[in-house]
């Protein structure tokens, strides 16, 4: 019998149950008997930026794209194709790789327990052969070409390459033709046994199922036969400066696009609080309710595509601003002026209160569906905090904290601008 701890959220009147199984797997379950079906996320703490690591006293390196390759191959095992089995249960399944995690997910209204068993079976039982790995290489190469045709992907990749000289976050998630050619069954097994260990994974489930039943299904279906030791990621020795400050490219887009990046210091302390502080700063700098945003919008310098965002992971952190604009250099100049003015004038406590209230409301709305909750549970667990901790952090963040962060961040010497022109302008 597994002892589950109940984690409650007074702000939402909601709760979830958490436990670590005997094998080390973290299980989080938000029981919602009034909701139909379930949504499950099985997440591993390995992403495209998981590259250099120690295992068994040896330094090892995974080629770019290995985490994504593993994601593809784990859903094609000895039992066949996982998606075909999910189709038999009526489940809608998917898998994806980001810079710091790999997730296997499904949503189902019928045969939910069978679907959960399928998920656990496939991820805990890798099957890599020379033939199936070589076959997958062609499939991933086609996906890579489609992936690189996305303007959003192009903008992000180019900015990260401009900001980071060494850190593997500068490399594409899917890898390159050269790195894919270096991936072998033996290398995939090494990566799997180093990082697909129960202690480095979390299963989050939300919907009409009990935590006890989830634990029972884990014991029945999740039995990875691991070899060797866990991998320990080695930090990249990233220099402070940026690689370059301005670059221009082109592709088939209807209007010029841009992305501004500020290279920040990697988060060393409370990750949740730091990310929230930067989110609030971005809202106060150029949120849709600010005079600055509306001046840019009314003058035609930006449109509704404009965004700001923090982008953080192990050993990297940057803030990004971008969208469509015919004059991206002008937008950057005005943004620098806005930052300088805000540093001089200080953070307005009343505006901060409004921003916190808005973030609070967004958090409440984001925890509605089974998919929203399971995804948030898994992500927060891998980052080292609980989803409901967000409310306490928002309640205690101060204007002084934001002001100090503002004075130490958004450094013009650690900033870059990438411009993506329509092909006909190049």
Where are these regions (language model features)?
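Histidine-acidic residue clusters that define the catalytic metal-binding segment
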Residues: 2-18, 162-201, 235-237, 363, ...
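M16 family metallopeptidases and their MPP-like homologs
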Residues: 30, 35-53, 65, 81-123, ...
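Short, polar/flexible loop-turn hinges at active-site or ligand-entry regions and domain interfaces
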Residues: 124-131
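Active-site-adjacent helix/loop patches that line small-molecule binding or acyl-intermediate pockets
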Residues: 150, 154
